[in-house]
A protein has these predicted regions:
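Ferredoxin-type iron-sulfur electron-transfer modules in oxidoreductases and energy-metabolism complexes
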Residues: 1, 80-83, 87, 123, ...
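Iron-sulfur-cluster electron-transfer modules
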Residues: 1-103, 108-115, 119, 137
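Short, structured patches in soluble enzyme cores that scaffold and shape functional sites
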Residues: 30, 104, 126-128, 153
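Surface-exposed, flexible loop/turn segments at secondary-structure boundaries
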Residues: 34, 108, 132, 157, ...
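Short, well-ordered coil/turn elements that cap or connect secondary structure elements
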Residues: 53, 119-121, 146, 175
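Short, acidic/turn-prone active-site loops that include or flank metal/cofactor-
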Residues: 126-132, 185
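Redox cofactor-anchoring modules in respiratory/redox and cofactor-processing assemblies
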Residues: 135-214
């Protein structure tokens, strides 16, 4: 569990928030983990810096951001999923939000592929895709200094949505030539991290957990 709320992570940052009257071209959808889990918060804060550096006009929902409902749907809680979906789509419509970027593969998949069934007419991009575009446009010029790095293909980004090249382009942009070392199981054959499909909440013995095998 966590005692954090959805706005605590950006209290010291100068960012637009839609419910404060701010307007922006793009919504940065942070997600539950991105706003309340320490390790993921670091990713969210880094993403804000990247967006600012590239001059992207973006805003946050803050306290008005509700879970996409992905975990609930995966474990059979369809009613909870639909309640979350309805509330989020109403929020998108209220602020005229049409473009969304997110760092979470699960949120990405749900917003992009499942929300349209409920009227969620959105352009949804993963942050790696957005950053790849910014690199090609010359709006980001990172310094490559990582001498050894690997990349894990998340199930919902890779197998479900076939986003393979953008993350690698981004990783290579901050690495020395040849620094990216592929895992034995990669791309469509990537080994699940053991957190999706509600599995993160299953009470398996450690030796039987997917992430331990991985």
């Amino acid at each position: 569990g966590t005692s954090k709320d959805r706005e605590e992570w950006f209290e010291d940052l100068d960012v637009k928030v839609f419910n404060r009257g701010d307007k922006a071209d793009t919504l940065f959808w942070v997600g539950c983990a991105g706003s309340m889990v320490d390790r993921n918060i670091e990713v969210s804060r880094a993403m804000v810096k990247v967006l600012d550096a590239a001059g992207v006009d973006f805003g946050l929902l803050g306290a008005e951001e509700v879970c996409t409902g992905d975990p609930a749907r995966r474990v059979g809680g369809e009613l909870t999923y639909q309640v979350c979906t309805k509330e989020n789509i109403e929020t998108f419509e209220r602020y005229g939000i049409k473009k969304v970027v997110t760092t979470c593969p699960h949120c990405f998949n749900t917003l992009k592929n499942e929300y349209p069934d409920y009227g969620g007419d959105l352009e949804v991009v993963h942050h790696s895709e957005l950053i790849e575009g910014l690199l090609h446009e010359g709006r980001l010029k990172p310094k490559g200094n990582l001498d050894s790095v690997t990349y894990h293909d998340p199930c919902y980004l890779g197998r479900h949505n076939e986003v393979y090249e953008a993350p690698r382009t981004v990783v290579e942009s901050v690495s020395e030539p040849g620094a990216l070392v592929e895992m034995e199981k990669n791309r469509s054959q990537s080994h699940c991290c053991g957190s999706g499909g509600g599995y993160a909440w299953m009470d398996d013995k450690p030796e039987k957990r997917i992430n331990q095998d991985r």
